[in-house]
Amino acid sequence: MSMRSPISAQLALDGVGTMVNCTIKSEEKKEPCHEAPQGSATAAEPQPGDPARASQDSADPQAPAQGNFRGSWDCSSPEGNGSPEPKRPGVSEAASGSQEKLDFNRNLKEVVPAIEKLLSSDWKERFLGRNSMEAKDVKGTQESLAEKELQLLVMIHQLSTLRDQLLTAHSEQKNMAAMLFEKQQQQMELARQQQEQIAKQQQQLIQQQHKINLLQQQIQQVNMPYVMIPAFPPSHQPLPVTPDSQLALPIQPIPCKPVEYPLQLLHSPPAPVVKRPGAMATHHPLQEPSQPLNLTAKPKAPELPNTSSSPSLKMSSCVPRPPSHGGPTRDLQSSPPSLPLGFLGEGDAVTKAIQDARQLLHSHSGALDGSPNTPFRKDLISLDSSPAKERLEDGCVHPLEEAMLSCDMDGSRHFPESRNSSHIKRPMNAFMVWAKDERRKILQAFPDMHNSSISKILGSRWKSMTNQEKQPYYEEQARLSRQHLEKYPDYKYKPRPKRTCIVEGKRLRVGEYKALMRTRRQDARQSYVIPPQAGQVQMSSSDVLYPRAAGMPLAQPLVEHYVPRSLDPNMPVIVNTCSLREEGEGTDDRHSVADGEMYRYSEDEDSEGEEKSDGELVVLTD
């Protein structure tokens, strides 16, 4: 007992682990006691790589410590390694066993806090140092390097995937650009093809329009009236009435024999010229005076007959001749074209005008001669008198120029005061600027197309154009207007003078002239009454306008009986000139010149207005 207290004091003072009853072996065993709790403490700290060793270190020091506390009483270190000291003799141990245990427990309670203090300071330092060393070791371990390498691999993989994505996006953009370019090329190609198709369609339309115009011209040529009443007598220059001289073929001169009337009235377009040398030799003097009046044939052509030698042409062309020449003028009163006019079903306007003119002529001639046979005999005699024909031709040809200069009914013929060499043209408007090139293109494609057809096509195209398409041409119009204003600052637009006509020494406008002719026709209708005569053939108005006997063969005695002797003045009858000449040779050829002059003067006075009125009607309707 007295020996244990100094042991505890000694332990408390120096802490060296020396005991009186223990050998040096106990001191050597103390060092593992100091190491044991350190190992246990360190083992208590969880190590990631060695869990089995930590559990063994933490379990081993507890078992020998308990064995030391229970089985040995002389060991100074309560936490021994498990090997007990050699026991004392059993006499002392048996005597003081229970009391020693109590003292040991009490001393243990006093010693343990001091030991814990000593162990805690040393143990904490070593534990902290070891932890720092272990932390330093952890930074450079293979696992951390593997983790870092894994992270780097992941980053490399991500970068490679990002690069692939960028490359694919770039290639897609290139493909999209190529596709867009191809689409644009396709659209441009489609647009070009559409424009070509539109151009082809326009050309086809122009061709169809040209064909339609040609067909219309052919139809008009077939249905046109055979009696043409121009406003002016034709000049010596070839007139552009129609390019085909075949239009004169259907209207052939009536043969010498009346038996051939129906053959010539039932006309056909390719009707040949009558091949009768005797008849042609007989008719040749009759055709020469009327050659300047032929509108469809060339002048001085002996083959072509007198196609348009209607009474209206004779009267209108011979108006200004002086009354000094002798010989009557109604030489073609019964001209062949008078009957085909009604036979073809021409409108009532021209036919009625011709009938009115004939009524006026008969009204004036009836007052002078007294009977309808006398002027007809004058016609028959005048056909045979060649000096009279020469005088008539001279009187008709030379006053033609005077008539052309005196009468300006056609507005496009003579404008000497406004269309001189110093005439300033107006600046072109937008339509004219556009139509200039378009007209040239159409003429290059279709050189035979008529100007009126081209104008219709251009007008329809201009109307179908939008304002945006017309804008550059309006700008060109403004530029031309400014240029024209700079070039001609004092320019003023002077419109063409209105059409006038000199009638009885007075210059009348078109409206006044028509009104005058209308009143004259009405007065002539009211003042003229035909008394019925016995033995004459009475015909209705429908027979006069549309003679039904046109295609009927008539007996030769009947024709010879009715035509020369009892001819109705209002009845348009085709007269056979050969038969008339045969009958007229035996008649009296004595007529006073005064009567002829008076007859011609009265006829010319009324026929001038009437025939010009009829000619004006035809020109305006066309």
Swiss-Prot record:
Bias (Basic and acidic residues): 581-602
Q: Which domain of life is it from?
A: Eukaryota
- Give residue spans, biased composition: Polar residues: 305-315
Tissue and organ expression note: Expressed in exocrine cells and islets of Langerhans in the pancreas (at protein level). Expressed in the pancreas, placenta, kidney, brain, heart, lung, and liver. Expressed in adipose tissue, cervix, colon, esophagus, ovary, prostate, small intestine, spleen, testicle, thymus and thyroid.
Q: Which residues bind DNA?
A: 424-492
Kindly identify the disorder that the protein's record connects it with: Autoantibodies against SOX13 are present in sera from patients with type 1 diabetes.
- Quaternary structure? Homodimer; homodimerization reduces DNA binding efficiency. Interacts with TCF7/TCF1 long isoform (via N-terminus); inhibits WNT-mediated transcriptional activity. Interacts with HHEX (via N-terminus); abolishes the SOX13-mediated inhibition of WNT-mediated transcriptional activity via competitive inhibition of the SOX13-TCF7 complex.
Q: Which residues carry this modification: Phosphoserine?
A: 335, 382, 385-386, 613
* Source organism of this protein record: Homo sapiens (Human)
Main localization (coarse):
nucleus
What is this protein's function per UniProt?
Transcription factor that binds to DNA at the consensus sequence 5'-AACAAT-3'. Binds to the proximal promoter region of the myelin protein MPZ gene, and may thereby be involved in the differentiation of oligodendroglia in the developing spinal tube. Binds to the gene promoter of MBP and acts as a transcriptional repressor. Binds to and modifies the activity of TCF7/TCF1, thereby inhibiting transcription and modulates normal gamma-delta T-cell development and differentiation of IL17A expressing gamma-delta T-cells.
GO CC aspect terms? chromatin; cytoplasm; nucleoplasm; nucleus
Name of this protein: Transcription factor SOX-13
- Renumbered residue ranges of the record's region Required for homodimerization: 84-344
Q: Where is it localised?
A: Nucleus; Cytoplasm
A Gene Ontology annotation in the biological process aspect, one of them, is: gamma-delta T cell differentiation
Q: Name one Pfam family in it.
A: HMG_box
Which segments carry the region annotation Disordered?
Answer: 27-102, 274-344, 581-622
MF annotations from Gene Ontology: DNA binding; DNA-binding transcription factor activity; DNA-binding transcription factor activity, RNA polymerase II-specific; DNA-binding transcription repressor activity; DNA-binding transcription repressor activity, RNA polymerase II-specific; identical protein binding; RNA polymerase II cis-regulatory region sequence-specific DNA binding; sequence-specific DNA binding
Recorded hits in SMART domains, A to Z, give: HMG
> Is Nucleus one of the keywords?
yes
Task: Provide this UniProt record's keywords sorted from A to Z.
Answer: Cytoplasm, Differentiation, DNA-binding, Nucleus, Phosphoprotein, Repressor, Transcription, Transcription regulation
